Amino acid sequence: MSSETASLLNGKALAQKIQGELKTTVEKLQGNIGRPPGLAVIMVGDNPASAVYVRNKEKACAKVGIASFGRHLPTETPQEEVEALIHQLNADERVDGILVQLPLPPHLDTVKLLHAIAPEKDADGLHPMNLGHLIRGEEGLRSCTPWGVMRLLEEYNLDVAGKHAVVVGRSILVGKPLALMLLEKNATVSIAHSRTPDLGEITRQGDIIIAAVGKPNLITGEMVKPEAIAIDVGINRIMTKDGASKLVGDFEFNSVSQVSSYITPVPGGVGPMTVAMLLQNTVLSYQKH
């Protein structure tokens, strides 16, 4: 094991750089288009974590010059009413991007609501048409978190071509689209998940390991190949011994940072990149006007 610790992949700094670039783009385009870009975020219920995420997205929009059209609905709002709102926003010319904040209350059909968003306004990149474009290697709006991971690797000149990338997690939000993006850039990709026996045997093969499970400290230093790149998508709130709460990722940071060459911190790694890519998707839709 090296006595050196891993270099940090600073998602917060890169997100700020991207926001600055987007602000310049918006300022240039606004005169021609005659209005700012618009992002509508739909939140149903009062999930405290979701409320924080929505506020962060609105603040980021303001920095870039994107108009926010927040829609906060009561927990008991019926499916038909949420669908009707989405159709209304699809038709609203001021709105370039639509995002449904997840998770939704259990009585709502998440998949059906995501399908209701017009593909060209799908700011989260989760519509089946956009995921289909990704599978085919075609242009389309990309899923924000995986795209943020790829952009972070690119910023630090970490070429994935020919590397063995191990993705831990198979969700439609992160694991599956990220595996496809890595394939698109010529990585050899393995996907591990909750039913994978001996996870460490798989992760130790990875030149790049991306953890997106949501289990605190799941992957320890002994499960990581020396000099591997560790990308932590997990955001988990745990209680410390003194009773305070703390955010940690899916990697056990202290041990993994002693083995890996690069690692993303939690917070300040992938999280800010997700928001930056959401803004990027909104501006891309805006540019098509």
From Swiss-Prot:
Subunit structure: Homodimer.
Catalysed reaction equations from the record: (6R)-5,10-methylene-5,6,7,8-tetrahydrofolate + NADP(+) = (6R)-5,10-methenyltetrahydrofolate + NADPH; (6R)-5,10-methenyltetrahydrofolate + H2O = (6R)-10-formyltetrahydrofolate + H(+)
Alphabetized UniProt keyword annotations: Amino-acid biosynthesis, Histidine biosynthesis, Hydrolase, Methionine biosynthesis, Multifunctional enzyme, NADP, One-carbon metabolism, Oxidoreductase, Purine biosynthesis
GO MF annotation list: methenyltetrahydrofolate cyclohydrolase activity; methylenetetrahydrofolate dehydrogenase (NADP+) activity
Name of protein: Bifunctional protein FolD
Pathway linked to the protein: One-carbon metabolism; tetrahydrofolate interconversion
One BP annotation, GO: purine nucleotide biosynthetic process
Keyword Oxidoreductase: yes
Residues annotated for NADP(+) binding in this entry: 169-171, 194, 235
Keyword NADP: yes
Gene3D superfamilies: Leucine Dehydrogenase, chain A, domain 1 (3.40.50.10860), NAD(P)-binding Rossmann-like Domain (3.40.50.720)
GO cellular component, one term: cytosol
Biological role stated in the UniProt entry: Catalyzes the oxidation of 5,10-methylenetetrahydrofolate to 5,10-methenyltetrahydrofolate and then the hydrolysis of 5,10-methenyltetrahydrofolate to 10-formyltetrahydrofolate.
Its EC number(s): 1.5.1.5, 3.5.4.9
Family assignment from sequence similarity: Belongs to the tetrahydrofolate dehydrogenase/cyclohydrolase family.
